[in-house]
Amino acid sequence: MSSYISLLKPRVIWLLILASVAGYIYGGGGVDSRLFSLLAVAFLSTGGSAAFNHYWERDIDALMTRTFKRPLPSGLITPNAALAYSLALSATGISLGFLLLGLLPGLFVLLGWLFYAVVYTIVLKRRTWLNIFGGGFAGNAVFLGGYALAKGTVDLPAVLISFAIYLWIPSHIWALAFKYRGDYKRAGVPMLPALIKEERAVAVISAINAAAAAYILWLYLQFGGGAGGALVALGVAATIATSIYAAVKKTEEAMWKMYKASSPILALFLIALILSRL
């Protein structure tokens, strides 16, 4: 059972589920039956797409020290079982998205699945370093789906807020990929840190990381408010400080500190948005 749970990538999808909840609460929703329906749909659809990613990438996972112990390369789950599991979860989540949430939220559920499972995993990841920019729209979709459920529509503030997720993803993934760039080279996956010189990679990733933090701060000043501002300030300060530190030091240790210190900023921002509406 634990192997099947790990296929869902719980350490990843919880943030996407939080984004859908933040979208719903920020859009005017409350703690009601629709919220619980949204939680179920978000869990099934994001978990299903994560499990499909495990299935599709089982060959490259076997070549990487970070992933070779995952259930498929280690033989704990067969490819056919993983595929059936992922498609069952995905189909259930997407179907319930339309049935329980409605047409527009259901459409965002479908788009989120397609951007991650198809655009990122199948089409782009092994072909171009731009893969992360295609898959990143899955993050926009989960927030917008929750917002559309509450509001009945999507407006400019919602779109702008959703891009906080989109901008956070590249620096977060690339900072992790920087540490394991040897793995990506060995597996033939064109992640940016595995393609360019280390110093240039550090400069690019730390700059994007700081820019994402500045954008999150601007968003909260424009559209947030209340006690949650302290959470945002904490996340922004930690992210910008460690980004500058990484840019100056240009070492793997400094990059890892930046990765660890800046990882919580998106969750803090989403929680602050929720608090601003409670």
From Swiss-Prot:
<dbReference type="GO" id="GO:0006783">
    <property type="term" value="P:heme biosynthetic process"/>
</dbReference>
<feature type="transmembrane region" description="Helical">
    <location>
        <begin position="35"/>
        <end position="55"/>
    </location>
</feature>
<dbReference type="InterPro" id="IPR030470">
    <property type="entry name" value="UbiA_prenylTrfase_CS"/>
</dbReference>
<feature type="transmembrane region" description="Helical">
    <location>
        <begin position="226"/>
        <end position="248"/>
    </location>
</feature>
<keyword id="KW-0350">Heme biosynthesis</keyword>
<comment type="function">
    <text>Converts heme B (protoheme IX) to heme O by substitution of the vinyl group on carbon 2 of heme B porphyrin ring with a hydroxyethyl farnesyl side group.</text>
</comment>
<feature type="transmembrane region" description="Helical">
    <location>
        <begin position="98"/>
        <end position="118"/>
    </location>
</feature>
<feature type="transmembrane region" description="Helical">
    <location>
        <begin position="158"/>
        <end position="178"/>
    </location>
</feature>
<dbReference type="InterPro" id="IPR006369">
    <property type="entry name" value="Protohaem_IX_farnesylTrfase"/>
</dbReference>
<keyword id="KW-0808">Transferase</keyword>
<keyword id="KW-0472">Membrane</keyword>
<comment type="pathway">
    <text>Porphyrin-containing compound metabolism; heme O biosynthesis; heme O from protoheme: step 1/1.</text>
</comment>
<protein>
    <recommendedName>
        <fullName>Protoheme IX farnesyltransferase 1</fullName>
        <ecNumber>2.5.1.141</ecNumber>
    </recommendedName>
</protein>
<dbReference type="GO" id="GO:0008495">
    <property type="term" value="F:protoheme IX farnesyltransferase activity"/>
</dbReference>
<feature type="transmembrane region" description="Helical">
    <location>
        <begin position="255"/>
        <end position="275"/>
    </location>
</feature>
<feature type="transmembrane region" description="Helical">
    <location>
        <begin position="76"/>
        <end position="96"/>
    </location>
</feature>
<keyword id="KW-1003">Cell membrane</keyword>
<feature type="transmembrane region" description="Helical">
    <location>
        <begin position="199"/>
        <end position="221"/>
    </location>
</feature>
<dbReference type="GO" id="GO:0048034">
    <property type="term" value="P:heme O biosynthetic process"/>
</dbReference>
<keyword id="KW-0812">Transmembrane</keyword>
<dbReference type="InterPro" id="IPR000537">
    <property type="entry name" value="UbiA_prenyltransferase"/>
</dbReference>
<comment type="similarity">
    <text>Belongs to the UbiA prenyltransferase family. Protoheme IX farnesyltransferase subfamily.</text>
</comment>
<dbReference type="InterPro" id="IPR044878">
    <property type="entry name" value="UbiA_sf"/>
</dbReference>
<feature type="transmembrane region" description="Helical">
    <location>
        <begin position="12"/>
        <end position="32"/>
    </location>
</feature>
<dbReference type="GO" id="GO:0005886">
    <property type="term" value="C:plasma membrane"/>
</dbReference>
<keyword id="KW-1133">Transmembrane helix</keyword>
<feature type="transmembrane region" description="Helical">
    <location>
        <begin position="129"/>
        <end position="149"/>
    </location>
</feature>
<dbReference type="Pfam" id="PF01040">
    <property type="entry name" value="UbiA"/>
</dbReference>
